[in-house]
């Protein structure tokens, strides 16, 4: 089972996923972003669904995205060095950059950050302000 973002998901779908996992199906997700921004404000993201399933079943679902260990391991195993990681989420982008010993830049995109924004090396108001920091 691969969990990706859907605009709407209901408890029936979550229970069906949980039943399949209990029946032995493997599960992984694209990302664990709790929310995602829309023109009308934030909506529950893929991570909100993943968190429900993890808590209901007492499991940890691996992710293909930042900052999961699979993703970090790929960079480390292939000697890929990043000078900067730029993103709008502390819990994914900034955490990922920190794990790779990169300088981290948090862009205030309007996404609620549930982690301390002081975890980022640099905090800026818009992506256009990033350029002076990296060049």
Question: What function would you assign to each model-found segment?
Answer:
Residues 2-135:
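Asp-based, Mg2+/Mn2+-dependent phosphohydrolase catalytic module
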